[in-house]
Amino acid sequence: AEGRQNKPDNKSFSNKIKRPMNQIAKAKLSDSAVMRWLALSIVSGTMMFAYFFTDVMSPLESMLSEGLGWDANEYGFFSGAYGLMNVFLLMLFFGGIILDRMGVRFTGLLCCALMIVGASVKWYAVSHIDPNAVVENFHLDLFIIKIDAPHTSNLVAALGFSIFGIGAELAGVTVSKVISKWFTGHELALAMGVQVATARLG
């Protein structure tokens, strides 16, 4: 009976060995300056393109007004759609929960997927939908923006921009966690500064 009680559990013993080995592998990866800065360049580049796509439509207001027939209210609605779901549907709150539960890899892929889908919808709206098509019997009264019978391209572009905004803002939170994970104990403040500076280039 004593022999059975003192017999080691091979399964639990192997698990104990695997855990330290995994921790050592991760520690070595983050200790490599090349890998740290490579990871930083990837996430910084992602945020740079996200900011670029967010702001690229601002100088095109006159072109959108002339080419698509959008008025000032429609353009204002489109511009504000970026943060619409994040503010009113609390998407960043739920995104933070997803990040804590699922980790940076899953959340990072989710952010990229949302940005690609949103950008594709927005591109389709401004390039393929008939500029003369309008949505009849549609009325929107949102704070100072009032829209009656808006252009179809405007509503679809706003939807795409909202989806893109969810991915872009959640990506900002994810990038902060990625940097803190890779650079804690190293050049954390420098990495944060480089990321912000690179992102603002967009």
Give the label of every model feature segment:
Residues L38-A72:
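Extracytoplasmic
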Residues Y51, D55, A149, S153, ...:
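Small-residue-rich segments within alpha-helical transmembrane domains of MFS-like 12-TM solute carriers
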Residues G80-I97:
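Central cavity-lining transmembrane alpha-helices of secondary-active solute carriers
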Residues A113-A149:
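C-terminal ends and interior cores of transmembrane alpha-helices
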Residues L170-F183:
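Intracellular juxtamembrane helix-capping segments at the cytosolic ends
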Residues I17-T46, A50:
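Cytosolic juxtamembrane N-terminal segment immediately preceding the first transmembrane helix
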Residues A189-G202:
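Glycine-rich segments within core transmembrane alpha-helices of 12-TM secondary carriers
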